[in-house]
């Protein structure tokens, strides 16, 4: 524990232990002599000072937001990977009802019309998620082997191969199916490496907002995908679906080109002993000189964490299940948060929005999909404020509660009012409009809470040595549940129709309680401070009162944050 207690460059707790660690690290670490001297001087001052005195850590000062335009744009370039995921979500919902797509990859009714069976629809839509799950686990390793930037370029190239196979499909649905698996492999790697790189290059006070830009790009992709489908639906040939797929080449080339401008992760650079490059990366992200003492302090903080992890040996898959280091608890949290993001029911609307709104009697369901896309995209801008100002826990709790209310109304109207004279008769236009309105409310609540925060939590919760593995498994949970929902939704809605909304309502109730008891607040903490929060065993519902060891006073009561004698229901009411 001595090493981890001194992850901060300046430590005012347990001075003797801190001095021993700095001494041991200095033998063959990259901690600067200046920072080692500074740390020892501070420790001695802490020993000789009066009771109640504490040292002040060197931190990179916050600047006006105008100073962070460059790093924000660079993070947006990385976040553009989410656009490719969103583009697929937005376009595939239209493909499955387009005439040329049905003629080429569907089956024929006796009357000569073409259709996709529920099984084939589910497979074509959902298999992408299975590819993503494996891509996140397998291809994300490139981020550890070659660096985050090169790793991203590799997975984008895999995505391009999948798109080529899909475009080349003529009338064999299984060829298109294989292409979706391969493009899914690429997007799965993107979904791990993009949030990871953003979380490692962003200033800590902007990390939540900038990681949320990944979700912003997903929503932009969904919206523009809907718009493109609307623009091509009037064609009668393969332009309907090949043009949207062809545009994927432009997005991929832009992504690869933009990555050349982005700084590499300083944590990765430190891990491969490129310390000077890491210093320049930190300085570029924070708009300060590489010679600034605060940059060196940040570098030393990262190096101390890496040195401690090296002492523990190489990370293995088995270590992910260690309860001693709290990695397993964090992995479970990441898996559950990503699973619950899917069980909110968002992809019920995004994947099958065109089909759903056709069933409520709308003449042009493509137009309604565009409305949903606009609401989703615009709402995500608001999420950039909510993530940092409300905090991560409050966002998740508030989102679960409000989405539950919207889903109850949506399902209840669909079950009781949509077909007042039976399904053989026309649907009620008023009930259909009501369902669309509450669908938009639901999407607003989702886009401002669970959509971005799930990725933020996954990107910042794991130690560096096991980060890619943990993020891959957590993301795989998202993709697997996305597959299950996308594949089984046609069957479930055929059997129970809008009662399906009550299933998601139950999931939203469960996730509210899960977040309250198992997800701590990490807003405004550095990645190393989040590590300390977990190691100290702070109760999630008390985590907002936790202060890192480097900033505590002598009267700080840590034990009160680690225990709670009140019944659970009283803890929730406080």
From Swiss-Prot:
GO biological process: carbohydrate transport; galactose metabolic process; galactose transmembrane transport
Location of this chain's protein in the cell: Membrane
Stretches in topological domain Cytoplasmic: 1-70, 143-149, 197-207, 264-342, 388-394, 457-472, 521-574
Species assigned in the record: Saccharomyces cerevisiae (strain ATCC 204508 / S288c) (Baker's yeast)
Residue numbers spanned by region Disordered: 1-57
InterPro entries recorded: MFS_dom, MFS_sugar_transport-like, MFS_Sugar_Transporters, MFS_trans_sf, Sugar/inositol_transpt, Sugar_transporter_CS
Disulphide bridges, residue numbers: none
Membrane topology: Multi-pass membrane protein
Source organism, top-level taxon: Eukaryota
Main subcellular location: membrane
Gene Ontology CC, one term: cell periphery
Official protein name in the record: Galactose transporter
Source taxonomy: Eukaryota, Fungi, Dikarya, Ascomycota, Saccharomycotina
A Gene Ontology molecular function term of the record: D-glucose transmembrane transporter activity
Similarity field: Belongs to the major facilitator superfamily. Sugar transporter (TC 2.A.1.1) family.
Modified residue annotations for Phosphoserine: 32, 35, 39, 48, 50, 53, 55
Keywords: Membrane, Phosphoprotein, Sugar transport, Transmembrane, Transmembrane helix, Transport
Extracellular topology ranges: 92-121, 171-175, 229-242, 363-366, 416-435, 494-499
SUPFAM superfamilies: MFS general substrate transporter
Membrane spanning stretches: 71-91, 122-142, 150-170, 176-196, 208-228, 243-263, 343-362, 367-387, 395-415, 436-456, 473-493, 500-520
UniProt function note: GAL2 is a facilitated diffusion transporter required for both the high-affinity galactokinase-dependent and low-affinity galactokinase-independent galactose transport processes.
Annotated Polar residues bias: 23-38
């Amino acid at each position: 524990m001595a090493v981890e207690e001194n992850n901060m460059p300046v430590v005012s707790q347990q001075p003797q232990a801190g001095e021993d660690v700095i001494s041991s690290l200095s033998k063959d670490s990259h901690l600067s002599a200046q920072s080692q001297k500074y740390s020892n001087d501070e420790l001695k001052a802490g020993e000789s000072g009066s009771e109640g005195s504490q040292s002040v850590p060197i931190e990179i000062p916050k600047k006006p937001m105008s100073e962070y335009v460059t790093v924000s744009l660079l993070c947006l370039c990385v976040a553009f990977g989410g656009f490719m995921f969103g583009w697929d979500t937005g376009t595939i919902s239209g493909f499955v009802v387009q005439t040329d797509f049905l003629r080429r990859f569907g089956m024929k009714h006796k009357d000569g019309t073409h259709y996709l069976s529920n099984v084939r629809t589910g497979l074509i839509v959902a298999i992408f998620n299975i590819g993503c799950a494996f891509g996140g686990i397998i291809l994300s390793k490139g981020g550890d082997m070659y660096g985050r930037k090169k790793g991203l370029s590799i997975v984008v190239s895999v995505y391009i191969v999948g798109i080529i196979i899909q475009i080349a499909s003529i009338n064999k649905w299984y060829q298109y199916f294989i292409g979706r698996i391969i493009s899914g492999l690429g997007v799965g790697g993107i979904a791990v490496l993009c949030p990871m790189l953003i979380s490692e290059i962003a200033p800590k006070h902007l990390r939540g907002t900038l990681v949320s830009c990944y979700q912003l790009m997903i929503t932009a992709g969904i919206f523009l995908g809907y718009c493109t489908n609307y623009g091509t639906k009037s064609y009668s040939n393969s332009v309907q679906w090949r043009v949207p797929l062809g545009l994927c080449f432009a997005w991929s080339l832009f992504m690869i080109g933009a990555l050349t401008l982005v700084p590499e992760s300083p944590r990765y650079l430190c891990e491969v002993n490129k310390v000077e490059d890491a210093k320049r990366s930190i300085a570029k992200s924070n708009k300060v000189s590489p010679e600034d003492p605060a940059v060196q302090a940040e570098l030393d903080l990262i190096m101390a964490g890496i040195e401690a992890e090296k002492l523990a040996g190489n990370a293995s898959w088995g270590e992910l299940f260690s309860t001693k280091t709290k990695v397993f608890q964090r992995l479970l949290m990441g898996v559950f948060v990503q699973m619950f993001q899917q069980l909110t029911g968002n992809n019920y609307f995004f994947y099958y929005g065109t089909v759903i709104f056709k069933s409520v009697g709308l003449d042009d369901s493509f137009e309604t999909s565009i409305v949903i896309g606009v609401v989703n995209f615009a709402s995500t801008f608001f999420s950039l404020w909510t993530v940092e100002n409300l905090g991560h826990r409050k966002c998740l709790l508030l989102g679960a509660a409000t989405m539950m209310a919207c889903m109850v109304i949506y399902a209840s109207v669909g079950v009781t009012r949509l077909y007042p004279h039976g399904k053989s008769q026309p649907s009620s236009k008023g009930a259909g409009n009501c369902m669309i309105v509450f669908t938009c409310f639901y999407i607003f609540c989702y886009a401002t809470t669970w959509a971005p925060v799930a990725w933020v939590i996954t990107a910042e919760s794991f130690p560096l040595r096991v980060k890619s593995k943990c993020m891959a498994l957590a993301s795989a949970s998202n993709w697997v549940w996305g597959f299950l929902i996308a594949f089984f939704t046609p069957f479930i809605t055929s059997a129970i129709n809008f009662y399906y909304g009550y299933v998601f309502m139950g999931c939203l109730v469960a996730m509210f309680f899960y977040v309250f008891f198992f997800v701590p607040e990490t807003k405004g903490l550095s990645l190393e401070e989040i590590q300390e929060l977990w190691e100290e065993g702070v109760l999630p519902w008390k985590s907002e009162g936790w202060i890192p060891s480097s900033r505590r006073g002598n009267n700080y009561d840590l034990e009160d944050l680690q225990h709670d004698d009140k019944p659970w229901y009283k803890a929730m009411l406080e």
